[in-house]
């Protein structure tokens, strides 16, 4: 598995600036050509659309989904929606927790949507749209920012308990527990924030 470290827009929380659906991706417009090349080469991406969502650069904060469908909040602008539709089938939802990517995480391997108990009502709606099973977690931590996975593994915040064999607790960015916000991941590689330590990288490579 290919591994790279970068900083985006001066931030090591690089997962906030992209959404990866295995070989296609949504990336923030603030990502430079050099950063985009590193992400594309490391993850082996075949298609990329660059945009904002709701006028903000943190596109990863607003998207959940899978390769054939992504879900975005109703705060998205029309021109942004049109860009996404160049690569994805898109569904727009009117929800309270419009930072979908921060609050929810869909894991294709097990067809599970992870959500906090207190977001159960909205999570049920989203799980239905994804045709996924719902996995509720008793936590007040942002679930989407705390999880990231591929076909082998679900990496998660050590402060969240997940009773799944392939779920492994890790940190990135020098102890950052919000691993979903700290990385971009697919089956071919992982790009992490530049603060990620050598020990954290070794632990990652051992898992994969």
UniProtKB/Swiss-Prot annotation:
One of the record's GO molecular function terms: translation initiation factor activity
Keywords annotated in UniProt: Initiation factor, Protein biosynthesis
Gene3D superfamilies listed in its UniProt record: L-arginine/glycine Amidinotransferase, Chain A
UniProt keyword Transcription, yes or no: no
SUPFAM superfamilies membership: Pentein
InterPro entries assigned: eIF6
Gene Ontology BP annotations: cytosolic ribosome assembly
Function description: Binds to the 50S ribosomal subunit and prevents its association with the 30S ribosomal subunit to form the 70S initiation complex.
Protein family (similarity comment): Belongs to the eIF-6 family.
Name assigned to this protein: Translation initiation factor 6
The gene coding this protein: eif6
């Amino acid at each position: 598995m290919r591994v790279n470290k970068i900083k985006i827009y001066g931030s090591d929380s690089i997962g906030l600036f992209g959404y990866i659906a295995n070989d296609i991706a949504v990336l923030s417009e603030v990502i430079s050509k050099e950063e985009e090349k590193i992400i594309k080469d490391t993850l082996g991406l075949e298609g990329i659309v660059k945009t904002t969502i709701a006028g903000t650069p943190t596109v990863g904060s607003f998207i959940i989904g899978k390769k054939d469908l992504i879900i975005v909040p109703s705060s998205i602008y029309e021109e942004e929606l049109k860009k996404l539709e160049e690569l994805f089938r898109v569904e727009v939802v009117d929800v309270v927790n419009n930072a979908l990517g921060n609050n929810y995480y869909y894991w294709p391997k097990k067809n599970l949507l992870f959500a906090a108990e207190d977001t159960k009502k909205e999570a049920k709606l989203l799980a239905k749209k994804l045709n996924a099973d719902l996995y509720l977690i008793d936590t007040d931590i942002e679930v989407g920012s705390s999880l990231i996975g591929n076909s082998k593994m679900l990496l998660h915040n050590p402060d969240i308990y997940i009773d799944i064999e392939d779920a492994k607790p890790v940190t990135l960015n020098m102890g950052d527990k919000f691993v979903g916000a700290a990385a971009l991941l697919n089956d071919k590689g992982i790009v992490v924030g530049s603060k990620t330590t050598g020990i954290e990288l070794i632990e990652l490579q051992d898992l994969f």
